[in-house]
């Protein structure tokens, strides 16, 4: 593949408010192990319009050799937070194509606890990723049990990505170990930029808008939890559905490395996965969600002394008082607010 300027480029999303503190924690944790910014650049991307991040955040990014990039590429889906997780990495993927061997995307609420020993891919692989956390019974209505039929949301995703048939292999959810059709968690991934996986996923998002494919999604605010009703999947999971379809379009099974739980461990399901005392000594990337706003979690968790000391100096993170208008509305009215935004976009496209 020839000489590349960078071995690995890391990237994550940052926006004004809560994501600032989370992304700073992630950046600090990465720089513990990847100190050379010339070999391991880190990009903090703000891919949609909104209030600028604080100057203090920018200064801390600079001290950590983190490149802050504001580029409002997410315009058609700027009402939907999770679309940032596609538009942001797609932007960096394109920017570093031909310059970096690998790009690692991480959700902002992830922290690197230990040095990744396998953060690369075999020569024949184009992507590394982990399966989704849970199945339908626990709330992920896009998880289709193996040998069941696809719903129309997945059929649309396959069609937009150019996937011709259902793969003949399966994955297991992290929590229940439920066997499902390939369906990946978008919180951690490592890709070869030249594979253009995130760019395909971004293009799929754009096609939903331009082709008016809204009827393929459930955005009523109700998650479907029973196997008897698999007609549509929630808009809530569209980023993971589309990313999975993009991966299946670009890669054969042999070109996909499926990492273990230690590379994207769902901390909020700790009790369901492990028994006490809970062991985090082997965890590489911990997906902590909202668990680091206090220290309640640490009393019965086993950790090596070095990692425990580092966390003691950096956690809990501050819960920002400011919450964006969109998030406040979402917290107050739930997914009905997404439905309202979705209908607004739908009506706009129908009138054009």
Language-model regions, residue ranges each:
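Glycosyltransferase catalytic domains, chiefly GT-A lineage
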Residues: 1-352
